[in-house]
């Protein structure tokens, strides 16, 4: 690109920062949008504008929805005695795609890194403990990733919840060490949910 296309370069740069996209893929996407600007680009702009106006974080679990309390939290068909703890909304959506988990969720928003010595206060654990007592939770499924950070976070959560009587379990087989839930296929994730084990 040359200096006369600063806006295009900036758009390519922004797309290249999205997960899974490099500069070459970003360039192809921008070119695709610009080749039919009146339809493709304007449709994308309109959709992004609507999302910006309407999407909010669920005040209970941390999911993304159009309502302050999301459809999962308000559903009468969910098992409200079981709660899965996930690191981000991406993992929540992955578990929903599996179609195998019918309980509630709690999104931490972060994980803990032993190397960087992060403050555990970045996790939404006081809200989690409050929910466990108020909602009479019987089982807490720790569904953090199988990375070192995910394991560190899982152990910290277990210690934090030790005074609550709920059974604490962890997703089981099928998740490789270092694996992230969002990248697993639905079948593997379903097996991990069904074969979850007590956390020790």
Swiss-Prot record:
Keyword Glycoprotein attributed: no
Leader sequence segment: none
Keywords: DNA damage, DNA recombination, DNA repair, Metal-binding, Zinc, Zinc-finger
MF GO annotations: DNA binding; zinc ion binding
Location of the Toprim domain: 81-176
Disulfide-bonded cysteines: none
One of the GO biological process terms: DNA repair
Family annotation (Pfam families): RecR_C, RecR_HhH, RecR_ZnF, Toprim_4
Cited Gene3D superfamilies: 3.40.1360.10, 6.10.250.240, RecR Domain 1
Zn-finger (C4-type) residues: 58-73
Listed InterPro entries: DNA_Rcmb_RecR, Rcmb_RecR, Rcmb_RecR_Znf, TOPRIM_dom, TOPRIM_RecR
HAMAP family, sorted: RecR
Function in brief: May play a role in DNA repair. It seems to be involved in an RecBC-independent recombinational process of DNA repair. It may act with RecF and RecO.
NCBIfam families per the UniProt record, alphabetical: recR
Annotated family: Belongs to the RecR family.
Protein name stated in the entry: Recombination protein RecR
Source organism per UniProt: Rickettsia bellii (strain OSU 85-389)
Lineage: Bacteria, Pseudomonadati, Pseudomonadota, Alphaproteobacteria, Rickettsiales
């Amino acid at each position: 690109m040359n200096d006369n296309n600063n806006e295009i370069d900036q758009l390519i740069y922004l797309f290249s920062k999205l997960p899974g996209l490099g500069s070459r893929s970003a360039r192809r996407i921008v070119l695709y949008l610009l080749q039919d600007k009146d339809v493709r680009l304007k449709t994308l702009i309109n959709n992004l504008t609507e999302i910006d106006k309407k999407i909010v974080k669920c005040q209970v679990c941390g999911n993304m929805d159009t309502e302050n309390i999301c459809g999962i939290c308000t559903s009468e068909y969910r098992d409200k005695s079981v709660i899965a703890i996930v690191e981000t909304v991406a993992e929540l959506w992955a578990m929903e795609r599996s179609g195998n988990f019918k309980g509630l969720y709690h999104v931490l928003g972060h994980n803990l890194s032993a190397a960087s010595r992060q403050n555990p206060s970045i996790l939404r654990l006081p809200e989690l403990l409050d929910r466990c007592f108020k909602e009479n939770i019987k089982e807490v499924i720790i569904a953090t990733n199988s990375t070192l950070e995910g394991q560190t976070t899982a152990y910290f959560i277990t210690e934090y919840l030790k005074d609550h009587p709920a059974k604490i379990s962890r997703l089981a087989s099928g998740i490789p060490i270092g694996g992230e839930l969002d990248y697993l296929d639905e079948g593997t994730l379903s097996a991990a949910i069904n074969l979850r084990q007590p956390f020790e």
